[in-house]
Amino acid sequence: MSFAPNASHSPVFLLLGFSRANISYTLLFFLFLAIYLTTILGNVTLVLLISWDSRLHSPMYYLLRGLSVIDMGLSTVTLPQLLAHLVSHYPTIPAARCLAQFFFFYAFGVTDTLVIAVMALDRYVAICDPLHYALVMNHQRCACLLALSWVVSILHTMLRVGLVLPLCWTGDAGGNVNLPHFFCDHRPLLRASCSDIHSNELAIFFEGGFLMLGPCALIVLSYVRIGAAILRLPSAAGRRRAVSTCGSHLTMVGFLYGTIICVYFQPPFQNSQYQDMVASVMYTAITPLANPFVYSLHNKDVKGALCRLLEWVKVDP
């Protein structure tokens, strides 16, 4: 990452994502502070409940606990810095920190999408082969699937970093590179670059699309088989129970993959800065916020564990 050839130092990026917003920075600060604190509180509570209550020591909740940790990481990569910039009114970030944020954002973000796909596989085994569910989706296998998700994600992220490192940027009179976003993401970095970015744009579209093809295919095939299995169930109560176990996961699949496709897998000429901003807020702030509530509000096991924990706290202060 460097300035144009006649520059002698690393670029400093000026994050201008909310500079044109018709909302005061104070209001934005308290809005994102509330989102971040609620995200951390919700996901920490879910992690503690799953770890504490033996009734939640099943493969589904093991994966859900891993997803909650990832969601906290994804929010922490972007939102604390955004809050600091909203307070300072001078949202600069040096090249090294920008690259670090870029790396960790993709590491957590891609892992998030892969774990969501693994959870679809878990639901498939639970509904289509319930007698062997505990054997097939044991904790060791779940741990291996989580580890594999991290390995694939980090390899993908290293490729993205490798595409960004050779790029050059031209600074303004103050030596800053204007970045039309609220954190260091791939497309805004490309738009601000003075290098030829055609190969980068193609890599985002095709390599990223290829990476998402596997998880998307796994999710679709899992739910096709799940749907067929549900239709074969003899009782309406059994069908409702099976559908309820998948409803939360399907909600987050649509939410997460919808925003990712909206930002990263449209042809460059159809992609706008405003569209990137809105979808990125949904992906980095709203999705991690929603996950613990979507998975717990309609889940009797989680609500029961929360009630037992509160009773235990009252009895043993």
UniProtKB/Swiss-Prot annotation:
Subcellular location, record wording: Cell membrane
Instruction: List the ranges whose topology is Cytoplasmic.
Output: 51-66, 120-144, 223-248, 298-317
Can you list the disulfide-bonded cysteine pairs? 98-184
Glycan attachment points: 6, 22
What topology in the membrane does the UniProt record assign? Multi-pass membrane protein
The reply to whether Membrane figures as a keyword in the UniProt entry is: yes
Name-wise, this protein is Olfactory receptor 1B1
- Which species is the source of this protein? Homo sapiens (Human)
Q: Which gene encodes it?
A: OR1B1
